Amino acid sequence: MLLNILAIILVFVISSQSEAVIPGCDYFDTVDISHIPKLNDSYAYEELIIPAHLTGLYTFRQLADGSQEPVKSHLRACICKLKPCIRFCCPRNKMMPNSRCSDGLTENLKRINPYLKITLEDGTIGKYYLLTDMIVLRYEFRYCEKVVSVQEDQYKLYENGSFMIKPDVNWTLSKQWYCLHPRLEDPNSIWILEHVYIPKSMPAVPQVGTISMVGCILTIAVYLYIKKLRNLLGKCFICYVFCKFVQYLIWAGGDLNLWNNICSLAGYTNYFFALASHFWLSVMSHQIWKNLRLINRDERSYHFLIYNIYGWGTPAIMTAITYLVDWAWEDRPDKLNWIPGVGLYRCWINTYDWSAMIYLYGPMLILSLFNVVTFILTVNHIMKIKSSVKSSTQQQRKCIQNNDFLLYLRLSVMMGVTGISEVITYFVKRHKFWRQVLRVPNFFHLGSGIVVFVLFILKRSTFQMIMERISGPRRQQPAS
């Protein structure tokens, strides 16, 4: 009896595993049908009846390079076995659940001549009407190496989904490495976007970002709690840490797919606070250098107002410009290298193409160079002052050296010296060796919330101010 039960369980497990992936079907020929109810052992998808043997449960998402990412178990159907499939691009901010897109492609195709020629396996060429003879699959925009406009006689589309551009040069793309975009102004041509492989992000990024977010919250709370810390520089520091907190919050929400319905809004918000954080770093660099040089440190209220206009106003203007550029060239694939692309590839600005240098890394480079120069001048000024003070004992010299290291480390963080590593990463990101080398400063930047909490909160003077704030002002003892 026990053996029979074990045999039944074994058969069930084997059969379940065999149905997990559809036999003889490429992953990129499948669509998610988990939202479609089963009817008479089949599924209805866009007026097609899909038999059960062409469906299967998938627990992964396959990437273009063949690697897999684990996802929630869902039902997929090998739709391209029933009709030829064609793959059109969809902006990330227009993607809907179950691989749908809200960009109005169907209406646009009706206004042009939506016919495509397909070379079949036997070598014959058939002419297919996109809206009835084919299944239109929607793929998210991915980073593109090339955007090419081809006429009807300049390409061959094969039945297996491969796309040959300009047959005389034999440039062929597999179905997972491209998507199409219609040219409404020229119905006899079409845009083809060749995808590129983007390396996966560093490990433990979500975890480090979440811990950094907590560090930012605690740092802001302490600075708001202790009045002595809320001087002009302290207020600027709070603004900077708040910018980092919002960035970490948006990143964490993106990992949890919370911004799917507001992808563009999340992207522009993240862009604004990313720029603002660098502008506030330059404000603090200027203020530290100014405090060091001036004997009379007069902190008038309008100074902070001016800093606010600069620290928040300039990023707001730049964010408005990026929005207008995206809006003006939204349906122009030939302008992909010129637009910020917020919400196009992901809920963030396009950081792969050289356009990122215009909208993000260019301003960051200018601000980072200013911060580095100011930091060098500040350290040089401090060293000159300290060199005039001679320590009497070796123990005192060692103590001063340790304090100097922490001082310079805190200054480097508050003055944004490490921010230049982001710009360097942009320039060398296509080189595997340098990407690995720059992981250390990138992790330092990613964990800046942890760093500021450790360096500026977990120190003796801050603890003393917290204890004084808790216990209240000390009362003077009366003379006896």
Curated annotation (Swiss-Prot):
Q: Which cysteines are joined by disulfide bonds?
A: C25-C78, C80-C85, C89-C179, C90-C101
Under the heading InterPro entries, the entry gives: GCR1-cAMP_receptor, GPCR_2-like_7TM, GPCR_2_secretin-like, Methusela_ecto_dom_1, Methusela_ecto_dom_2, Methuselah_N_dom, Methuselah_N_sf, Mth_GPCR
Cellular component (GO) terms are:
membrane; plasma membrane
Q: Which residues are tagged as glycosylated in the record?
A: N40, N160, N170
Q: Looking at the record's lineage, which domain of life comes first?
A: Eukaryota
Membrane topology, Extracellular segments: 21-202, 255-263, 327-356, 429-437
**Which biological processes are named by the entry's GO terms?**
cell surface receptor signaling pathway; determination of adult lifespan; G protein-coupled receptor signaling pathway; response to starvation
Indicate how the chain sits in the lipid bilayer.
Multi-pass membrane protein
Q: Which residues cross the membrane?
A: 203-225, 232-254, 264-283, 304-326, 357-379, 406-428, 438-457
Keywords from UniProt, A to Z, are: Cell membrane, Disulfide bond, G-protein coupled receptor, Glycoprotein, Membrane, Receptor, Signal, Transducer, Transmembrane, Transmembrane helix
Subcellular localization: Cell membrane
- Residues on the membrane's Cytoplasmic side span 226-231, 284-303, 380-405, 458-480
Gene3D superfamilies the UniProt entry points to: 2.30.160.11, Methuselah ectodomain, domain 2, Rhodopsin 7-helix transmembrane proteins
Q: Mainly localized where?
A: membrane
Q: Which GO terms describe its molecular function?
A: G protein-coupled peptide receptor activity; G protein-coupled receptor activity
- The region annotated as signal peptide is 1-20
What PANTHER family does this protein's entry cite?
Answer: G-PROTEIN COUPLED RECEPTOR MTH-RELATED
Q: Which family does it belong to?
A: Belongs to the G-protein coupled receptor 2 family. Mth subfamily.
Q: What is this protein called?
A: Probable G-protein coupled receptor Mth-like 6
Q: What organism is the protein native to?
A: Drosophila melanogaster
The gene for this chain is: mthl6
